[in-house]
Amino acid sequence: LVIIVRHAERASEPATDPALTPAGERRAEALATALADARIGTILTTTYRRTRDTARPLATRLGIEPQAVAVRSGGPDTHIQDVVAAVRRASGNVLVVGHSNTVTAIVAALGGPAWPPLCDTSFGQAFAVQPNGAQTAVLRLRYGEPDAAPGAGCL
């Protein structure tokens, strides 16, 4: 089972690598509570602070060291391929903490449906993907406080 989420709410400064806002910290705790019994064996993040901070409460609770999948040159497609390769090497159920432009693309790369990217205001969606040969089951779930209504062309 692979659970894919976007990082929690982030501050606007510093622009290059912001921390989570207080709302984001609460959402990260809500994620840890929601997944406490999900038998997560591997946590994958990017090298960006907001993804690591989102994963931290669950990682601490489970005693797991998150693995950062670097965002290399080559754009999002290269990163998505790297994440999928890391998922396939992982042990146990996997949590992937990504970004608005990668979450649904990772779902699709694992065999799920092609959805538009997440909206800038979408932080509380989780996608549970169960690859199973030719059949891939996907559940779209919500956790934490409700998000703002999505805009056009995004989830």
What are these regions (language model features)?
Residues 1-91, 103-127, 131-155:
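Active-site-proximal alpha-helix that buttresses catalytic centers in soluble enzyme cores
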Residues 93-95:
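Acidic/histidine-rich alpha-helical segments that form the ligand environment
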Residues 97-99:
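Short beta-strand segments
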